[in-house]
């Protein structure tokens, strides 16, 4: 974002672009390093409402320079670049509730694909040869035509990431964690915002306890939203610090991953086979059909003496994280070795 926003200027003394460069982005990078978080950043070329071609290249050198600067720093920090769209007009025809959001509607899948081809050109010009694997739909609205358009233009796409849950009457795109027959996947975001409510955090922890995933989303421009009217930058900054600090304290065993790395984890989660054998001496796990190290949570009152085929890390008085690097994994209890 550019220009001046009174709310930001009055609190920080910075214009909008300097606020993001000098305060917001350093805070994001610091949080990533301090709390062991990886980011997947989503690219958008225009905030216009055009839904009919021709889609002209963005005539904004400052925006292009920002994509270069922020993108390179994101990649350097171990992150990943994905896409949000040519613009913020959800890829859907009429009937998906866009009128309530003030969005334009697309007449055809061909128009959607034409806009995405311009986005692809825009990215290729800045990051030649970079493969795009992740897509997040604007306002969490995505039609079958829009989904097909993304896949047709960005043929390396692996992850569609929208919402985990919501109202049954909503027109948003809700997902479960799954692999699709075309080689793509559904990896929803379970929570969002810089200062989520306790209810939202509780819902995110429910997902985490369900399948071991914490997936959170923030908009850089959230401070501009009507819903953020009573939120200052200081409140939002502290809210994110509190969220990540609590996450690290409670679930410090979580492994940070980008969208593509999450896709690889999901592949193993769905496709791997394993068997478990218990004995007085310990536990044996035999697994197959996996590419990356597997992670299990083991709850036991017993003390682990030795491990072969991987590692074990105590995370609570009666719980361990098991990391399996070999198809044959064995634990022996202390005193039974």
State the predicted function of each range.
Residues 1, 32, 125-126, 132-134, ...:
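Catalytic grooves of carbohydrate-active enzymes
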Residues 33-146, 167, 218-224:
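Metal-dependent polysaccharide deacetylase catalytic core of the NodB/CE4 family, i.e.
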Residues 62-72, 167-175, 195-205:
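Alpha-helical scaffolding within the catalytic cores
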Residues 286-303, 331:
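Surface-exposed beta-strand/loop patches in extracellular or lumenal glycoproteins
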Residues 316-337:
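C-terminal beta-strand-rich structural cap/linker in extracellular carbohydrate-active enzymes
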């Amino acid at each position: 974002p550019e220009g001046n926003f009174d709310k930001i200027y009055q609190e920080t003394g910075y214009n909008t672009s300097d606020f993001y460069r000098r305060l917001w982005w350093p805070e994001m990078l610091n949080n990533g390093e301090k709390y062991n978080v990886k980011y997947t950043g989503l690219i958008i070329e225009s905030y216009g409402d055009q839904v009919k071609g021709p889609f002209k290249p963005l005539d904004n050198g400052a925006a292009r320079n920002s994509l270069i600067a922020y993108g390179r720093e994101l990649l350097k920090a171990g992150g990943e670049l994905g896409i949000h769209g040519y613009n913020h007009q959800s890829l859907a025809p009429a009937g998906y509730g866009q009128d309530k959001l003030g969005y334009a509607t697309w007449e055809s899948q061909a128009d959607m694909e034409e806009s995405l081809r311009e986005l692809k050109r825009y990215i290729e010009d800045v990051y030649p040869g970079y493969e795009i694997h992740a897509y997040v739909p604007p306002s969490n609205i995505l039609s079958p035509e829009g989904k097909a358009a993304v896949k047709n233009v960005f043929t390396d796409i692996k992850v569609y990431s929208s919402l985990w849950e919501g109202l049954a009457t909503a027109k948003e795109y809700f997902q479960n964690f799954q692999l699709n027959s075309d080689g793509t996947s559904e990896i929803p975001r379970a929570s969002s915002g810089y200062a989520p409510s306790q209810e939202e955090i509780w819902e995110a922890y429910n997902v985490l306890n369900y399948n071991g995933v914490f997936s959170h989303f923030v908009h850089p421009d959230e401070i501009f939203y009507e819903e953020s009217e009573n939120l200052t930058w200081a409140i939002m900054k502290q809210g994110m610090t509190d969220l990540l600090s609590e996450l690290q304290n409670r679930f410090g065993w979580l492994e940070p991953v980008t969208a593509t790395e999450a896709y690889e984890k999901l592949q193993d989660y769905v496709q791997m086979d394993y068997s478990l054998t218990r004995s007085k001496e310990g536990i044996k796990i035999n697994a197959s059909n996996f590419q990356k190290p597997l992670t299990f949570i083991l709850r036991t009152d017993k003390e682990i003496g030795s491990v072969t085929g991987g590692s074990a890390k105590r995370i609570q008085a009666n719980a361990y994280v098991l990391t399996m690097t070999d198809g044959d994994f064995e634990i022996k209890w202390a005193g039974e070795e």
